[in-house]
């Protein structure tokens, strides 16, 4: 079996997280991969950083997001780090360095 290049593999895992979240929530979610995987300078030990845009955030959605990311990452032997947000939060906090960085280097999944 041919090995996937690191970024391709990370995107495939991010898409799996997105699909499982969308299915569980019953509506589409937006996922943006950022960090070393998105920049293409990830190492073998690098995690996969995902900004997950949800319709709303509460304790249940945070737990569900954490569970899905953990399961997908565990099965693949990768750590998947997630940051939940909403579209309104992204607009409101757009001037913060974190969101500027995600906008600059992020890859929509």
PLM regions: where:
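Catalytic core of pol beta-like nucleotidyltransferases
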Residues: 1-30, 38-44, 55-109
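Short beta-strand->loop micro-motif that forms the acidic, two-metal-ion catalytic signature
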Residues: 48-52
């Amino acid at each position: 079996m041919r090995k996937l290049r690191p970024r391709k593999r990370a995107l495939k895992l991010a898409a799996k997280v997105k699909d499982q979240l969308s299915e569980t929530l019953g509506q589409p979610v937006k996922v943006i991969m950022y960090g070393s995987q998105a920049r293409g300078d990830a190492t073998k030990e690098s995690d996969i950083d995902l900004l997950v845009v949800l319709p709303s955030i509460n304790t249940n959605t945070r737990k569900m997001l954490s569970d899905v990311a953990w399961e997908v990452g565990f099965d693949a032997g990768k750590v998947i780090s997630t940051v939940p947000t909403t579209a309104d939060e992204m607009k409101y906090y757009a001037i913060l360095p974190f969101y500027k960085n995600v906008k600059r280097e992020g890859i929509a999944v």
